[in-house]
Regions:
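Aromatic-lined carbohydrate-binding/catalytic grooves of carbohydrate-active enzymes
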Residues: 261-394, 400-404, 414-416, 421
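C-terminal beta-strand-rich structural cap/linker in extracellular carbohydrate-active enzymes
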Residues: 635-665
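Polysaccharide-binding surfaces and accessory modules of carbohydrate-active proteins
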Residues: 2-197, 211, 621-634
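Alpha-helix-loop-beta-strand connector modules within alpha/beta enzyme cores
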Residues: 336-343, 430-449
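Short Pro-Gly-centered flexible turn/kink motifs
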Residues: 215-234, 653-661
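Glycine-rich, aromatic-flanked loop segments that form ligand/cofactor-binding clefts
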Residues: 11, 16-23, 171-187, 233-253, ...
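Active-site-proximal substrate-binding groove within the catalytic cores of carbohydrate-active enzymes
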Residues: 9-11, 16-25, 31, 209, ...
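Conserved, mostly hydrophobic/aromatic
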Residues: 66, 220, 296, 343, ...
């Protein structure tokens, strides 16, 4: 039997209004289209609750988001519950079982590719592949992580932990059956949820929205809820994933857009608790030695009025002053303006860390404006609190010529929102207004500062979704890389998994100099290192050999980064946990060129591996260059297509990087 035709997906949302089921497909709508191709479909419930769904198509993909507005003059609208911002049915054929003991035929298993989110673990971003049929089957090479277990039924439930969109779960999914499938991604930087349910005929119902809502609107209130991208495909799993990455790169990311940086940044990072003299000395070292960095990244610890030393993130009480965003004049007597000037004279962008949403409740802003808070969070849904947050950030960007604003968020907000909801009886409303305020904050900053990029941290990669990706990029995708000598094999796993989805993300190789395996393990579209991070690392101790190695690595990374604009493909199937007896490898291809990166891990007994490459033209030949030695060799496209490429790595815990380009056959 042939696969179902690729469906044309249309927006559909459902909810209960005062207990009555509302289906947008069954409503009479007014429709208008904007000049940029956006479609606005509006219907009204009960004569007073106006619901507008805004949608736009990019090729086979469609995105939509819904807005709710109360037009009545009485005290409130009816009650909205069981809201599904997306409620669609996607046709899939039943999995075939020739007999009770046989395996499902290849290509006829329906698989749900659901990746883990970030949770400071080695298995972050790994994939849990679940099949739907008369039984529950799994690919043997991938383990089931019990966090997502919903029982051996035809319903599977997904949700993040604690109100941050990619904490524990990852709001990007691919349901695949052979060549046919559908990718969808949820846009909500709070507590979304997703249910997948399979019908007896094989159809899969996709339901996404905000978790556990029960609210009404007041006169004049207008809110939005979660967005969704749905992209059907008929080209197979790998090409479907590549198409989705291109979609995010071309239509959602700010990188490469007018006024913004052409590429994600290459940074040297510093602890903000260093003195200004120490920061200036380190930044001048970058320029004097021509190390090749593009941004100076100043992290936490630069703010608050304390005098005790804070030599690194693990010493001192800098954390107690989070929420006081005045520069610490004891350690930075020139108000960080000398640091900004050092960046400018060394042709570096200035990246500065803040955590604008979290505040120590003993600080002056809390005493002056307790109404700004939900617990220990600045309430971005409160207009006065929002204005304070915007003014605080914008003044720093303007005064210090900030090129990249780094926003962290190290708390789980869900319980705080729910506690606030309990006061006024509108479950989910504080979350909705808070998240709308977050989007407005970033949109306003990007509008006022056309050069700006926003780094979205949130404890390392815990707020990654399509709404944050259109406004920011995660330069620090996981806090598992926090230790100075973090496990780089885990970084390889993270990189290989998350690159399936995101065209732009990053991490850091840490403070260790001279370890090429470590540095290459952390190459991503954005990359950082910190050889002069804290008071422990003295610029005078950075030798000529150290500087030469840093220059070589940064130059190599920039060459890699250009090719990361292309299509990505992992060349091995990784286990969720780190296996040091294996190899890991991946490929990027951009038109007729690309690179292959391979790692032989510390306990691998194998000195050779062969990899099948994608994007190879059998009628052409390909010139390969070894990045370590500069040696070149040629392989015909026919041989590459039939046999792949053999990579030899003689020593354990070593890597090989080959650049290649097509030449005439």
């Amino acid at each position: 039997m042939s696969a179902p035709p690729v469906p044309v997906v249309k927006p559909r949302l459902t909810f209960l209004y005062n207990g009555e089921f509302v289906d947008s497909d069954l409503q009479t709508k007014s429709v208008r289209e904007s000049e940029d191709g956006r479609l606005y479909e509006t219907f009204t419930i009960g004569g007073t609750l106006e619901v507008t769904t805004e949608s736009i198509r990019h090729g086979d993909a469609i995105e939509w988001v819904s807005w709710f507005e109360y037009k009545g003059i009485s005290d409130k609208s009816g009650q909205v519950t069981q809201l599904c911002d997306c409620n669609i049915n996607v046709p899939f054929e039943l999995d075939l079982y020739p007999d009770s003991l046989a395996r499902i035929q290849e290509g006829r298993t329906t698989l749900v590719y659901a990746h883990n989110g970030s949770d400071w673990n080695e298995y972050d971003f790994s994939c849990d592949v679940e099949s739907y049929g008369d039984r529950v089957l799994r690919k043997a090479a991938l383990s089931q992580l019990p966090r997502y277990r919903a029982g051996n039924t035809n319903v599977k439930h997904f949700a993040p932990i604690g109100g941050r969109s990619s904490h524990g779960a990852f709001p990007f999914y691919n349901i695949n059956q052979g060549d046919y499938g559908v990718i969808f991604a949820i846009g909500w930087t709070g507590q979304w949820n997703c249910d997948l349910e399979r019908a007896l005929d094989g159809t899969i119902n996709i339901r996404t929205g905000l978790e556990d809502v029960d609210w009404h609107l007041l006169p004049g209130e207008r809110i939005r809820t979660s967005s969704i991208i749905v992209m059907p495909y008929s080209s197979g799993y790998e090409k479907g994933q590549q198409a989705f990455r291109r979609l995010l790169r071309d239509y959602y990311s700010l990188i490469g857009k007018p006024g913004r940086p052409e590429r994600a940044p290459l940074c040297m990072s510093f602890w903000g608790g260093l003195t200004s003299d120490g920061l200036v000395e380190r930044i001048d070292k970058i320029g004097a030695e021509r190390l090749g960095y593009e941004f100076a990244w100043v992290d936490a610890g630069w703010y608050g009025q304390f005098t005790e030393p804070s030599p690194n993130e693990f010493e001192g009480n800098w954390w107690a002053y989070t929420g006081d965003w005045s520069v610490n004049r004891h350690f930075h007597p020139d108000n960080l303006e000398d640091v900004s000037a050092a960046c400018k004279r060394n042709n570096l962008g200035f990246l500065l860390w803040l955590e604008i949403e979290r505040v120590n409740t003993k600080l002056p802003v809390v005493k002056a404006h307790p109404e700004y808070l939900i617990g220990d969070m600045i309430d971005l849904g409160n207009e006065a609190a929002w204005a304070w947050a915007y003014k605080t950030i914008a003044n720093l960007i303007r005064r210090l010529n900030i090129s990249c604003y780094r926003q962290d968020f190290n708390i789980t907000p869900l319980g705080r929102w729910r506690d606030a909801d309990a006061v006024d009886g509108r479950k989910g409303m504080h979350e909705i207004k808070y998240i709308m305020g977050l989007y407005r904050l970033w949109d306003s900053l990007l509008a006022e500062f056309p050069h700006l990029i926003i780094d979205n941290c949130a404890s390392g990669g815990r707020r990654i979704d399509i709404e944050t990706l259109r406004r920011s990029l995660p330069l620090w995708r996981d806090d598992y890389q926090c230790p100075a000598n973090h496990d780089v094999d885990a970084a390889q796993n993270h990189n290989i998994a998350i690159s399936r989805w995101l065209p732009y993300h990053g991490t850091s190789s840490g403070r260790i100099v001279g370890d090429t395996y470590r540095a290459r393990s952390c190459y991503a579209p954005a990359f950082a290192s910190s050889p002069l991070y804290s008071s422990t690392e003295n610029p005078e101790n950075l030798s000529d050999d150290d500087c030469a190695w840093i220059r070589r690595i940064n130059n190599e990374f920039k060459k890699v980064r250009e090719l990361m604009q292309g299509d990505y493909r992992p060349l091995v199937e990784m286990s969720p946990t780190v296996d040091r007896s294996t190899w890991s490898a991946y490929q990027y291809s951009l038109k007729d060129e690309g690179f292959v990166m391979a790692f032989r891990r510390a306990k691998s007994p194998f000195c050779e591996a062969r990899f099948e490459l994608c994007g190879i033209d059998p009628l052409k030949s390909y010139l390969f260059e070894d990045s370590d030695t500069g040696q070149t060799f040629t392989i015909s496209g026919k041989e590459l297509s039939e046999k792949g490429i053999s990579v030899v790595i003689d020593q354990p815990r070593s890597s090989k990087l080959y650049f290649y380009k097509a030449i005439q056959g």
